[in-house]
Amino acid sequence: MQENTRLRIAIQKSGRLSKESIELLSECGVKMHIHEQSLIAFSTNLPIDILRVRDDDIPGLIFDGVVDLGIIGENVLEENELERQSLGENPSYKLLKKLDFGYCRLSLALPQENKFQNLKDFEGLRIATSYPQLLKRFMKENGINYKNCMLTGSVEVAPRANLADAICDLVSSGATLQANNLKEVKVIYESRACLIQKENALSKEKQALVDKIMLRVAGVMQARESKYIMLHAPKEKLDKIQALLPGVERPTILPLAHDEKNVALHMVSKENLFWETMEALKEEGASSILVLPIEKMLK
């Protein structure tokens, strides 16, 4: 019965989302001990169990109501949703928040020597992919007939191995494509990590915990996007200096001891401060400019 009273969160056991999912939960105050071979981690300060599973399994665990929350890439989520729909099912879930990591794109790629003018160049080609449903939807929307070559891994080697004419695979930097003499020619899907919840209603206690976690997730993400700025500014240039700073709220202006001409300005900036902005601040007379990271933030 204990497991039914604890919030169950599914995350990727290993792979590109695993580390950042754990970091997000930790920054939200979820204390846990992760053992490499363990499939379940128990929070020591909150009634939360972390299930570490294959990313392909997370959507199904949410659709079937086995776990309460899941952190998953949009590409995997939508691929699994389309697969269920193709079987006549109607999978459902709640999208709680798009997260600030796991960015990638699903793209069509051809051998470097192939010329590419438009999507019609894929007509009749055999395309290797691990995302057959997303590829099928895109090709259908664009009226392209093709032959599917389903692979669960190492998709990029398919053209060299004469398994396929082209590929449809995830791309982050493009280095893997270049290493396999391929070129990216068309992005068909943009993806990032997201936090989802099962459709069935949670108990009052679990929902209260989810609400608390969501507030913390928002705070963590806002803190990551923000910087705390401190500087000294001439009173006569204060308006110009403030105009250079993209703030979340109005700044705090403080007097400086034994200085009638300058004040201290403290504020939270909603954007990273680039060197060009700092140089512009300096030109307007600002001095002692400090830009600090923010660990936690609640509005």
UniProtKB/Swiss-Prot annotation:
Q: Give a single Pfam family match.
A: HisG_C
This entry's Gene Ontology molecular function terms read:
ATP binding; ATP phosphoribosyltransferase activity; magnesium ion binding
Question: What disulfide bonds does the UniProt entry report for this chain?
Answer: none
EC number in record: 2.4.2.17
Known cofactor(s): Mg(2+)
Q: Which UniProt keywords apply?
A: Amino-acid biosynthesis, ATP-binding, Cytoplasm, Glycosyltransferase, Histidine biosynthesis, Magnesium, Metal-binding, Nucleotide-binding, Transferase
Annotated catalysed reactions: 1-(5-phospho-beta-D-ribosyl)-ATP + diphosphate = 5-phospho-alpha-D-ribose 1-diphosphate + ATP
Gene Ontology, cellular component aspect: cytoplasm
Its GO biological process annotations read: L-histidine biosynthetic process
Tell me, in one coarse class, where this protein mainly resides: cytoplasm
| Pathway noted in the entry | Amino-acid biosynthesis; L-histidine biosynthesis; L-histidine from 5-phospho-alpha-D-ribose 1-diphosphate: step 1/9
> What does the protein in this record do?
Catalyzes the condensation of ATP and 5-phosphoribose 1-diphosphate to form N'-(5'-phosphoribosyl)-ATP (PR-ATP). Has a crucial role in the pathway because the rate of histidine biosynthesis seems to be controlled primarily by regulation of HisG enzymatic activity.
Q: What protein am I looking at?
A: ATP phosphoribosyltransferase
**Source gene?**
hisG
